[in-house]
Design a protein with these regions (language model features):
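Generic structural signal of hydrophobic/aromatic residues within well-ordered alpha-helices
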Residues: 5, 47, 51, 135-139, ...
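General structural signal for secondary-structure boundaries
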Residues: 39-46, 114-127, 138-147, 236, ...
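Short coil-to-helix leader/linker segments, especially the first N-terminal amphipathic alpha-helix
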Residues: 244, 248-287
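Solvent-exposed soluble domains appended to multi-pass membrane proteins
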Residues: 269-679
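Transmembrane and membrane-interface helices of multi-pass
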Residues: 2-250
Length: 679
């Protein structure tokens, strides 16, 4: 009986050997495809420890390739010889199922990295409300989905051959042991040794669960290189980390915990308990208008309109000539580093509208927020100054329920381009082409100007710079040889890169034309231009002569942010070079509101000096740009190159917690969302 078990568990061990090799091959492919360096020369110690540590971390799942057949095949097979005879067939079948799981997880990671330049993270959960047919469109048209699916069969055949090879390796014969007691002792030692071996591998070469591999214990040599640190993590452990951590801990907080975090941040001296809800704790008083009250205010949010392309290093690409016409205007005030309120589109738009951070809670999807009376909401507060507010979206506002959420924030009109541009308007899966959308929106603003009253606020949000990049750019005047004649040839002549970069140019041109049209029609207008978020352009520009490195933190995360009005210049920003989405509303009120006007804002205006900006995801000072994902940050300023990276404790964690807990508290108390302060 035990001789059958002895032979069988060795087959389990042979099956187990195949999968760390498969995971290492996947890791090698990932590094080959996405490595930002032209050569690995001088980095081989990093590569070695990346694979070494990744091997042990992968045992979080791979160790079960030994345990499961051990329990389901070898143990019962020891008592049922006929069942044991089927063992290798069952192992092959189970191994192919696990191989398919690894293949799909790896393919998903490769796609995810191409879009977000990161391994699986919480964005996976933020996509829960994404339009499924749109995801399918991207999968098949941008990410070679058909090839991925067709690749399953040859991949499985190759895995079957590999598994059969390992299962065919010679086994150790059961030793001849004289005497029953020594034989039972040997058998017991083998059985216990199998269990011990499982735990030793499962815990990453240790018998202590607390010492098993995790992100914090990646060798520092590897962790300092962000790319190889990410390459260390196998796909299933990465997905496990996403799934085992809730998107937001807000639901598990107590009221006392949240109020204690909010209290240090409030600007109103009254106790939180005396206010209709904690959002009222952020009352501020305007010091007096700095400009003539504009009849039109335009908040323009460009899809992924990032600061990076305004940097001198990337001037040769000439992708932002439309925006630069305003950015370089002497009556423009701009910051050079900014924070978006969210890491993807909807949380940023929600935060800009509502005046509180979405914090990953998808407020626009919650019915309780479709009837909110938040005092911090930008259009609601502008109404107190006599402004009629309109939200213009280049897509369909019903996606994400913004047809419900935007009016609740105080918008008098919510206009959706998929309706007012007509059914035949050219569009991507996200929305109508920016040029068509903005031309039609401009015409409607001009046509209905009198009907909207003397003071108007227009919030416009575009969509076209979004994959898959299928806009026929040549039809709209894009020729890389004419647009970017000074760009390096490996960018200018690369068709794949040009689909991406050309779409950015296309969106910028539409933006510039709209701004010019509105400024000609309404020269006293106040314009605020920003992006919903930035984007890691490493996937597009790395491996080129222009960018022989990965994009740094600032380049990955900083959207554009500037203000334009005939009565301002750069000096209006009090020397500030940093800012964020949540500084926009208070800056507007301090520019236009009369002295004594009360408004509500989490953050101060940019008309007074600020030394830091915080969001749920990032922190920013004049000296550094960091995230709350890890302890690394990018030092800014003279003396530091674009690749500089430092490690240190995360600052402003209390402030971050307070902002997030404010949102969490309001989510848990929907009955407070309609509460208003008595006057």
């Amino acid at each position: 009986m035990f001789s059958i078990f002895y032979a069988s568990f060795q087959q389990d061990a042979k099956l187990f050997l195949f999968f760390p090799i498969l995971c290492a091959l996947f890791r090698a492919v990932f590094i080959k495809v996405y490595c930002p360096y032209p050569s690995l020369r001088g980095r081989w110690p990093v590569v070695f420890h990346c694979f070494r540590y990744g091997f042990w971390w992968g045992m979080d799942f791979n160790a079960y390739v030994f345990l499961i057949p051990f329990v389901l095949i070898s143990l019962p097979g020891a008592f049922i010889p006929a069942y044991a005879a089927l063992g290798d067939t069952l192992r092959l079948a189970g191994g192919l199922v696990y191989s398919l799981v690894l293949y799909l997880a790896f393919a998903g990671k490769m796609i995810f990295y191409s879009h977000f330049h990161d391994i699986y993270n919480q964005i996976v959960k933020l996509g829960g409300h994404a339009e499924k047919h749109n995801l399918a469109d991207i999968f098949f048209h941008q990410n070679h989905g058909a090839l991925i699916l067709l690749g399953i069969l040859p991949f499985e055949l190759a895995c079957a051959a590999g598994i059969r090879f390992f299962l065919s390796l010679s086994s150790l014969p059961y030793p001849e042991i004289a005497g029953a007691v020594p034989r039972y002792a040997f058998n017991t030692a083998v059985f216990l040794g199998c269990i011990a071996a499982f735990y030793w591998f499962r815990y990453g070469g240790t018998f202590w669960h607390d010492n098993k591999p995790e992100w914090d214990t990646i060798p520092s040599l590897v962790k300092k290189d962000i790319f190889f640190a990410k390459a260390t993590v196998d796909d299933l452990p990465a997905l496990e980390q996403v799934m085992k951590h809730d998107l937001n801990e807000a639901y598990s907080h107590t009221d006392a915990e949240d109020l204690a975090a909010i209290a240090p941040l409030k600007t109103d001296p009254r106790p939180l308990e005396d206010l209709p809800n904690p959002a009222y704790a952020f009352r501020r008083t305007a010091k007096g208008a700095r400009i003539t009250k504009p009849k039109h205010i335009f908040l323009f949010v460009g899809e992924t309109y990032l600061e990076q392309f305004f940097d001198p290093q990337f001037a040769c690409l000439n992708l932002v000539s439309g925006g630069k016409q305003f950015r370089n205007d002497p009556h423009t005030a701009a910051v050079t580093s900014a924070l978006s309120a969210g890491i993807i589109s909807r949380p940023s738009i929600v935060s800009l509208m509502s005046g509180i951070f979405d914090a990953g809670l998808e407020l626009n999807e919650k019915e309780s927020f479709w009837q909110n009376r938040l005092p911090t909401a930008l259009p609601r507060q502008l109404a107190k100054l006599g402004y009629h507010s309109t939200y213009w979206y280049g897509g369909n506002v019903t996606y994400g329920n913004f047809n419900q959420f935007a009016p609740a924030c105080g918008f008098d009109e919510v206009r959706t381009a998929t309706d007012f541009c007509g059914p035949d308007a050219p569009r991507t899966w996200v929305g109508v082409y920016d040029n068509v959308f903005l031309e039609k929106a401009a015409a409607m603003i001009l046509q209905d100007n009198d009907a909207r009253g003397p003071y108007q606020f227009h919030f416009l949000y575009t969509t076209s710079y979004h994959g898959p990049f299928k806009i026929p750019l040549a039809r709209y005047g894009y020729d890389p040889e004419k647009v970017m004649p000074d760009a390096p040839e490996d960018i200018r002549k690369d068709r794949t890169r040009q689909k991406n970069l050309g779409t950015f140019w296309f969106s910028d041109q539409a933006l510039g034309k709209f701004l010019r049209t509105m400024k000609e029609a309404y020269p006293d207008s106040l314009f605020i231009v920003t992006g919903d978020h930035a984007y890691d352009m490493s996937a597009v520009l790395s491996h080129t002569s222009l960018l022989p490195r990965e994009c740094n933190l600032r380049e990955r995360h900083s959207p554009v942010l500037f203000f334009n009005h005939p009565e301002i210049d750069q000096s209006i920003l009090a020397g500030n070079t940093i800012g964020g989405h949540m500084n926009i509303a208070p800056t507007v009120f301090e520019l236009i509101a009369p002295e004594g006007f009360e408004y509500y804002s989490l953050n101060p205006s940019l008309l007074e000096p600020i030394d830091h900006v915080v969001s749920p995801y990032h922190w920013l000072t004049r000296e550094a740009y960091g995230t709350y994902d890890d302890d690394f940050y990018q030092p800014l300023g003279e003396g530091y190159g674009p690749e500089a990276l430092k490690e240190g404790p995360q600052p402003f964690t209390g402030e971050r917690a307070g902002y997030m807990d404010l949102t969490g508290y309001l989510v848990r108390h929907p009955e407070l969302l309609r509460a208003e302060e008595a006057h």
